[in-house]
Amino acid sequence: SLIQFEKMIKKMTGKEPVVSYAFYGCYCGSGGQGKPKDATDRCCFVHDCCYEKVTGCDPKWDDYTYSWKDGDIVCGGDDPCKKEICECDRAAAICFRDNLNTYNDRKYWAFGAKNCPQEESEPC
């Protein structure tokens, strides 16, 4: 679920997820189009694509099982669909952490769709 994803992001990056990522670049937050603007925005693009591949459950609302082991996220549970959601969220949270050095909220926060032309969109 989005709430679990927020917790993963907070723990991995130390940032407040909604403030830091919900309005970043062309793909972080709701929707997405255009070309990802930097590595963090690409994390969101890949996460959106990952969610598109999930079938049989709702990535935004269905809770899944996960735990922390040695600073890493471990997805668990018996439901393969929910585990898939968890793996999408896990990969994005790690991606955000690994790209903190190029995160640029001054440049890409509240970027707006007008700066993300539909014709520049990439396939998943």
From Swiss-Prot:
Disulfide feature: 26-116, 28-44, 43-95, 49-124, 50-88, 57-81, 75-86
Binding, Ca(2+): 27, 29, 31, 48
Annotated InterPro entries: PLipase_A2, PLipase_A2_Asp_AS, PLipase_A2_dom, PLipase_A2_dom_sf, PLipase_A2_His_AS
Tissue: Expressed by the venom gland.
Comment on bound cofactor: Binds 1 Ca(2+) ion.
SMART domains recorded: PA2c
Keywords of the record: Calcium, Disulfide bond, Hydrolase, Lipid degradation, Lipid metabolism, Metal-binding, Secreted
Catalytic activity: a 1,2-diacyl-sn-glycero-3-phosphocholine + H2O = a 1-acyl-sn-glycero-3-phosphocholine + a fatty acid + H(+)
GO biological process: arachidonate secretion; lipid catabolic process; negative regulation of T cell proliferation; phospholipid metabolic process
GO CC annotation: extracellular region
Compartments, record wording: Secreted
Primary residence: secreted
Pfam families for the chain: Phospholip_A2_1 (PF00068)
Gene3D superfamilies linked to this entry: Phospholipase A2 domain (1.20.90.10)
Active site, per annotation: 47, 89
EC number of this enzyme: 3.1.1.4
Keyword Magnesium (UniProt): no
Top EC class for this record: hydrolase
Role this protein plays: PLA2 catalyzes the calcium-dependent hydrolysis of the 2-acyl groups in 3-sn-phosphoglycerides.
Name of the protein described by the UniProt record: Acidic phospholipase A2 BA1
Biological source species: Gloydius halys
